[in-house]
UniProtKB/Swiss-Prot annotation:
This is Cyclic nucleotide-gated ion channel 18. GO terms for cellular component: apical plasma membrane; cytoplasmic vesicle membrane. The transmembrane domains are indispensable for pollen tube guidance. The binding of calmodulin to the C-terminus might interfere with cyclic nucleotide binding and thus channel activation. Belongs to the cyclic nucleotide-gated cation channel (TC 1.A.1.5) family. Residues 565-580 are annotated as: Calmodulin-binding. It is found in: Cell membrane; Cytoplasmic vesicle membrane. Keywords: Calmodulin-binding, cAMP, cAMP-binding, Cell membrane, cGMP, cGMP-binding, Cytoplasmic vesicle, Ion channel, Ion transport, Ligand-gated ion channel, Membrane, Nucleotide-binding, Transmembrane, Transmembrane helix, Transport. Expressed in pollen grains. Not detected in leaves, roots or root hairs. It comes from Arabidopsis thaliana (Mouse-ear cress). The chain crosses the membrane at residues 54-74, 87-107, 143-163, 175-195, 218-238, 346-366.
Length: 706
């Protein structure tokens, strides 16, 4: 005997009884049948929850089906009733299908575990998995109610009881049919309402959206109107049949004319006796609901005959009866004119009471469902009104108020009032990590520096990222201000510019798009082995050109990640950092420009000296020294090429070179005199500041980390 393996590998979220065992089967099909036979389901599993939703919908549709039996009898001729065979067969078919679902629901309850009452002291409680205990508990509680709801009583009444009635089949409007249907509504209601509460307890809601919840409550109200309209129609037919029966009894008592019960059945219309009786009887005149001289009091049921509802086709008949039920249920029966007939009076009282209860429940439930849609909108309106009052109270300038309004509006459009951070923090760590990885991993991988990291550190970075919103015109960083976070752009465009510390005539700008990042000064600061607590200053001004959505990585989190990453040193990482850093790019571009200009000036001076072959080339006068020459040759190599100029431009070129040399020499002399202590206020203004090389991060391994 082998232990049957768990069904978790075949069906998700199902539980197999631990005490169940079976012999080893030869084929997979036999094993699968054994597994299904001994399978015990978790009441909170997805398969049970899905079945509860399906069975709830089926049960409500079955409640809609039963009142259609009331439309089977109709007035088929003068003083006779008939039955709609096609309607009866259609309703019977669908009602049988609904009964099959009830049978399957009984089977599901026999295989669904329950929580032991004694184990509910802490947590969810312990599931009882023994099939015998489950069956005994179910037989003692809900089994009889489920069986009573499953029995095909309306089918038996309409197809067996009424046709087998004595003295013909005239009494098609027998009250037994209505009684059976209404009585069976009781166990079906005992099934639906606890099932509804069980679904809410398991999933938290019966409908996922507010509109679906409102439609569900409205559907229940329409169901009540549907039942009332069908009962009114059947009662009208029954009231008409009662009038015919009373007149027939009077005729038989006087022994003037024989009135057989079969004459009230439309099947006897072709009989000679029936035709003779129709010509001489007073049934038609005494039971005419459209006549005001009729002694029989039809009361509220006369409308069914004055509007010819009893003789029209099924669709028109059903829609009119449904409208009648909606009208009187919503008005609590105030428009009904009744007679002294006891059944009619009780029916009107029932309509009034149920109308008051159901209409109150409908308004309350629909209001709750629809308010859940607008609760965030209302909270946003209140917050926006408070913001407006605060700005007016503090007398903020109009342009600043407009920027605040744009930010509040953009935040609402981006989040719809949902606090994403609180949602993420309420989830387990593993699930939160997976969500952050899904949202941020592809964006972080676009950063070449982070693309060199392993998945573990990338997960750590993704877990530290938080969402950030900026409106157009907002300065994210200002040049010289401390940088406290690094931004990864998701949507929008950002302008990153620098003036090299306010240098006159210097301006460098670039546009950041989705996938780019800014605040790379933090990388250098974080990778320094002995970095201070002071945050680095921003070398660029970063301003949002449009509404920007981004992820932000704080300085503390980046410091932690960078410290962990120092163990994974790579020369490729250093090159990637230099190449993609806007700060290093700006320095490199300026360095190349400066070197190129020096090269062009030196080449021009060489050409002049070679042409004149005397003394117009003075390295000291042009501002170059041996150190500059060695630096240039180190980066660019020695110059071996010469050049020539056109004779027509030679004179102008010589004069220009002399002017430049004199100007440069005067500037150097003033700068040197200022450094030796001479007080000359204009000398410092002529000295041009240099573009400093950015600090290089330390990618080496510390001894203490080894």
């Amino acid at each position: 005997m082998n232990k049957i393996r768990s069904l978790r590998c075949l069906l998700p979220e199902t539980i197999t009884s631990a005490s169940t065992a079976a012999s080893n089967r030869g084929s997979d099909g036999s094993q699968f049948s054994v597994l299904w036979r001994h399978q015990i389901l978790d009441p909170d599993s997805n398969i049970v929850t899905y079945w509860n939703h399906v069975f709830l919908i089926t049960s409500i549709l079955a409640l809609f089906l039963d009142p259609f039996y009331f439309y089977v009898p109709y007035v088929g001729g003068p003083a006779c009733l008939s039955i709609d065979i096609s309607l009866a067969a259609t309703v019977t078919f669908f009602r049988t299908v609904a009964d099959i679902f009830h049978l399957l629901h009984i089977f599901m309850k026999f295989r669904t575990a329950f929580v032991a009452r004694s184990s509910r002291v802490f947590g969810r409680g312990e599931l009882v998995m023994d099939s015998r205990e489950i069956a005994m508990r179910y037989l003692k509680t809900d089994f009889l109610i489920d069986v009573a709801a499953m029995l095909p009583l309306p089918q038996l009444v309409i197809w067996l009881v009424i046709p087998a009635a004595t003295n013909g089949t005239a009494n098609h409007a027998n009250s037994t049919l209505a009684l059976i249907v209404l009585v069976q509504y009781i166990p079906r209601s005992f099934i639906i309402f606890p099932l509804n509460q069980r679904i809410i307890k398991t999933t938290g809601f019966i409908a996922k959206t507010a509109w679906a919840g409102a439609a569900y409550n409205l559907l229940l109200y329409i169901l009540a109107s549907h039942v009332l309209g069908a009962m009114w129609y059947l009662s009208s037919i029954g009231r008409q049949f009662s009038c015919w029966s009373n007149v027939c009894k009077k005729d038989n008592a006087l022994r003037v004319l024989d009135c057989l019960p079969s004459f009230l059945d439309c099947k006897s219309l072709e009989q000679p006796e029936r035709q003779y009786w129709q010509n001489v009887t007073q049934v038609l005149s005494h039971c005419d609901a459209t006549s005001s001289t009729t002694n029989f009091k039809f009361g509220m049921f006369a409308e069914a005959f004055t509007t010819q509802v009893a003789t029209t086709d099924f669709v028109s008949k059903y829609l009119y009866c449904l409208w009648w039920g909606l009208r009187n249920l919503s008005s609590y029966g105030q428009n009904i004119t009744t007679s002294v007939y006891l059944g009619e009076t009780l029916f009107c009282i029932t309509i009034c009471i149920f109308g008051l209860i159901l209409f109150t429940l409908l308004i309350g439930n629909m209001q709750s469902s629809l308010q859940s849609m607008s609760v965030r909108v209302e909270e946003w309106r209140v917050k926006r009104r408070d913001t407006e009052e605060w700005m007016r109270h503090r007398q903020l300038p109009p342009e600043l108020q407009e920027r605040v309004r744009r930010f509040v509006q953009y935040k609402w459009l981006a989040t719809r009032g949902v606090d994403e951070e609180s949602i993420l923090h309420s989830l387990p760590t593993d699930l939160r990590r997976e969500i952050q990885r899904h949202l941020c991993l592809s964006l972080v991988r676009r950063v070449p520096f982070f693309s060199q990291m392993d998945d573990q550190l990338l997960d750590a970075i993704c877990g530290c990222l938080v969402s950030s919103l900026s409106t157009a015109g907002t300065y994210i960083f200002r040049e010289g201000d401390p940088v406290n976070e690094m931004l990864f752009v998701i949507r929008g465009q950002i302008e990153s510019s620098t003036t090299n510390g306010g240098r006159s005539g210097f301006f460098n700008s670039t546009t950041l798009r989705p996938g780019d990042f800014c605040g790379e000064e933090l990388l250098t600061w974080a990778l320094m082995p002995n970095s201070t607590l002071n945050l680095p200053s921003s070398t660029r001004s970063v301003r949002a050109l449009s509404e920007v959505e981004a992820f932000a990585l704080s300085a503390e989190d980046l410091k932690f990640v960078a410290h962990q990453f120092k163990r994974l040193q790579s020369k490729k990482l250093q090159h990637a950092f230099r190449y993609y850093s806007h700060q290093w790019r700006a320095w490199g571009a300026c360095f190349v420009q400066s070197a190129w200009r020096r090269y062009k000036r030196r080449k021009l001076a060489k050409e002049l000296s070679l042409h004149e072959s005397s003394g117009y080339y003075y390295p000291d006068e042009t501002g170059y020294n041996e150190e500059d020459e060695e630096t240039r040759e180190y980066y660019y190599g020695s110059d071996e090429e010469g050049g020539s100029m056109d004779n027509t431009n030679l004179g102008a070129t010589i004069l220009a070179s002399k002017f430049a040399a004199n100007t440069r020499r005067g500037t150097n002399q003033k700068a040197s005199s200022s450094s030796t202590g001479k007080k000359d206020g204009s000398s410092t203004s002529l000295k041009m500041p240099q573009l400093f090389k950015p600090d290089e991060p330390d990618f080496s391994i510390d001894k203490e980390d080894v």
